[in-house]
Curated annotation (Swiss-Prot):
Lineage start: Bacteria, Bacillati, Actinomycetota, Actinomycetes, Mycobacteriales
Active site: 263, 302
Induction of synthesis: By EPTC (S-ethyl dipropylcarbamothioate).
Protein name as annotated: EPTC-inducible aldehyde dehydrogenase
Binding annotation for NAD(+): 219-225
Organism: Rhodococcus erythropolis
GTP-binding recorded as keyword: no
Length: 506
């Protein structure tokens, strides 16, 4: 066990500033109106720094810097851009513990996740896109013996990115790495609930990028996010967050006819066929862990497996074993490497989760385990903690809506057809899980479930080279994978005639 000292205390490996301005043109720039907002840590509920409360004027300053940088950056060779991305990855790796601690303190998630998942994944995404942009090729087509069509990938120019609060650094890197690799300049707005871990990161890597290529402006959605998303000075907007806000982002983008990438809500089914209990072996243990994945990152994952579907003939036995597994999840200080589940990202989210739990109880859903706020005592008593909670009910209950917390709603199904029917009975289609020892069943279920990613005999893996995105109301476009480069590029066609004679029309 390792317990990290809190930022700013004796023996701490990093400290936050007491106040953060915006990062514009590789400099710290105070908000135009001089306003700041408090930023509490979810670990204790206490404020630890103040952050720029930006407005449209600050967005304009960032756009000025981005537009000044975009032409030269877009013409930088892909080899040079790849070198810079790899340098960013190296610098992050050298400072992994510091960045992980900042992320855990700002967001509340266990440091074992930031040390072993979030930040290493972010590092790998930079390295992946450094390689992907080097490997990307244009094309040519021979129209006839004298005419050739050449196709080039060109950057869009200046793009806007709005980042969620559940994975502040990793979700930022999902967007930053391909956008930078493709040669775009960026104005990025973090979530106001988790505004500073990305600023700690930029303090580490900022000097590696030319001034103005990456600009970070903090603030609230209406005051800063809307001016960015609706600006006629951006060529694309990428957003991760709730579906309601995603609709607004689309409206703003439509006014300027610019493309959007939207990664929105989810209520992912996790389907367990009866053969998962065919033997008491490693696979069974893996499936039980797969059930408990609803509590990863405190359930604050768009693809959290928050609807568990268990086949009738194993329902009672599997649920009893899953409840034991859930009760064994260790909740505690997020800075302790033995802690498995930490704090919710904000007090508002805490209250939302608790209200849904009460709704579930009122609707008649049965609490198998959890169902209350976690009172950890001591200096954690003001933090935002919820017990991992397992409900049983049916798919029509409100607890089967997106809660975005460590809550799973469990129901049963008779056969394959009913499993698919229940799994698809949702507005969302971001992720899903299928568990079966029968490869044919697992494959068919994966194809029949309406979701952009279906984990099969696994869950919550997010490699850089696997496409991620939603069906239905879970979003538009994809993130990660080589195909993501095209989301930040436009195609230039040069149609060239090498003939000496006129075409003969006039």
């Amino acid at each position: 066990m390792t317990k990290y000292a809190r930022p700013g205390t004796a023996d701490a490996i990093m400290s936050f500033q007491s106040r953060y301005d915006n990062w514009i043109g590789n400099e710290w720039v105070a908000p135009v109106k001089g306003q700041y907002f408090e930023n509490p840590t979810p670990v204790t509920g206490q404020n630890f720094c103040d952050v720029a409360r930006s407005t449209a004027e600050d967005i304009e300053l960032a756009l000025d810097a981005a537009h000044a940088a975009a032409p030269a950056w877009g013409k930088t060779s892909v080899a040079e851009r790849a070198i810079i991305l790899n340098k960013i990855a190296d610098r992050m790796e050298e400072n992994l513990e510091s960045i992980a601690l900042a992320e855990s303190w700002d967001n509340g998630k266990p440091i074992r996740e930031t040390l072993n998942a979030d930040i290493p994944l972010a590092i790998d995404h930079f390295r992946y896109f450094a390689g992907a942009i080097r490997a990307q090729e244009g094309s040519l087509s021979e129209i006839n013996s004298d005419t050739v069509a050449y196709h080039f990938h060109e950057p869009l120019g200046v793009v806007g990115q709005i980042i969620p609060w559940n994975f502040p650094i990793l979700m930022a890197v999902w967007k930053l790495a391909p956008a930078l690799a493709a040669g775009n300049a960026i104005v990025l707005k973090p979530a106001e609930q988790t505004p500073v871990s990305i600023l700690h990161l930029i303090g580490i890597i900022g000097d590696l990028l030319p001034a103005g290529v990456l600009n970070i402006v903090n603030g609230f959605g209406v005051e800063a996010g809307k001016p960015l998303a609706s600006s006629p000075r951006i060529k694309k907007i990428a957003f991760t967050g709730e579906t309601t806000t995603g609709r607004l982002i689309m409206q703003y983008a439509s006014q300027n006819l610019i493309p959007v990438t939207l990664e929105l809500g989810g209520k992912s089914p996790n389907v367990f066929f009866s053969d998962v209990l065919a033997s008491n072996d490693d696979y069974q243990d893996k499936a039980l862990e797969g059930f408990t994945m609803f509590a990863l990152n405190q359930g604050e994952v768009c693809t959290a497996p928050s609807r568990a579907l268990i086949q009738e003939d194993i329902f009672d036995e599997f649920l009893a074993m899953a409840a034991i597994r859930t009760k064994a999840v260790r909740q505690g200080d997020p800075l302790d490497t033995d802690t498995m589940i930490g704090a919710q990202a904000s007090n508002d989210q805490l209250e939302k989760i608790l209200s849904y739990i009460e709704i579930g109880k009122a609707e008649g859903a049965k609490v198998i385990t959890g169902g209350e706020r976690a009172e950890l005592g001591g200096d954690l008593s003001g933090g935002y903690y919820v017990q991992p909670t397992v409900f049983t009910g049916n798919n029509k209950m409100r607890i089967f809506q997106e809660i975005f917390g460590p809550v799973v709603s469990v129901t049963s199904f008779k056969d394959y057809d009913e499993a698919i029917e229940i799994a698809n009975d949702t507005l969302y289609g971001l992720g899903a899980g299928v568990w079966s020892r029968d490869g044919g069943v697992a494959y068919r279920a994966g194809r029949d479930i309406q979701a952009g990613r279906v984990w099969t005999n696994t869950y919550h893996q997010y490699p850089a080279h696997a496409a991620f995105g939603g069906y239905k109301q879970s979003g538009i476009g994809r993130e990660n994978h080589l195909m993501m480069l095209s989301h930040y590029q436009q195609t230039k066609n040069l149609l060239v005639s090498y003939a000496q004679k006129a075409q003969g029309f006039f």
